[in-house]
Amino acid sequence: MNTPQKPIHQVLLAVDGSEHSLAAVKTVRDMALAATHCRECRVKVLGVLPVSEGSNYAAYMLPLREAERLLNEHSISATADLIQGYPAEVIVDQARVMQPDLIVIGAKGLRATLGILLGGVAQQVIEHACCPVLVIRAPYRRINRVLVCSDGSVCSRKAIEFAANFPFIEGGDFHLLHVLPPSPVLTPELLARVWTLSDDALDPTLFTTREMEAEVEASRKAGDMILHEANELLLAQNIKAKTMLLQGDAATEIIQYASDNAVDLIIAGSRGLSSMQSWLIGSVSRKLVHYASCSMLLVKQPLA
């Protein structure tokens, strides 16, 4: 079934003057120029004036005006707005009001702790945003090689549909990846290597080698089907991807694959959560956005 075209019309772009936010501005420029509906795209360049910095309004407006200029000179409709408050709270609140198709934010801001891979503001926005979030890492580089992750879930399907309609630079290199669960399957024999088990527990009839092989084969077939269905969604939008089936810890395998193949952007889904659970976006998604060295697009499944 073809994926309906859902172009990105409204973008909320968070800017604070950091190197990462400048890379985010340039990425939004690339997106808008790659989109067939470029002139219909509206970008809100949002800055946050810390409560303690009220007297420095002009200084905080400078990077916003520069971002606005950089976008406007390419005929991209952009307006700048500086709001006083707490950064993550302001960005999330503005997203609720604006209902953008996408939030774009730098991975780290000016005040990020040295050595961390993801700043606190970006982390909070990812956790609480009501729409897809694109986290851009510096230095700026055009998004050419894209890794789309699929696990067969509804959240994953939403991410693939979003990716299929994302305005990438023409001629991009797409990779589609599914990770099978770690092997081997837990058996009494394996447990016996660590635990002291009774002879009855080691009864080979409990789980035979043939049954183990059948489980592995069934898992592989399920993985192939997940890749096939995901690939069909991309092909519906004329996106040809290299498919890859790996096995192991999902986050570890994805991060390693992205590193080995010089991926510019990882795209993954994440389930929407209630306010009680909002600190958790899913263990795999959380690891990817924290530890991947490239930019990350996280597409959240809205709450029912």
Which residues fall in each region the model found?
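Gly/Ser-rich helix-loop-strand patches that form or flank binding pockets
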Residues: 1-10, 88-140, 252, 256-304
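Short, solvent-exposed loop/turn segments at secondary-structure boundaries
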Residues: 55-58, 70, 116, 278-279
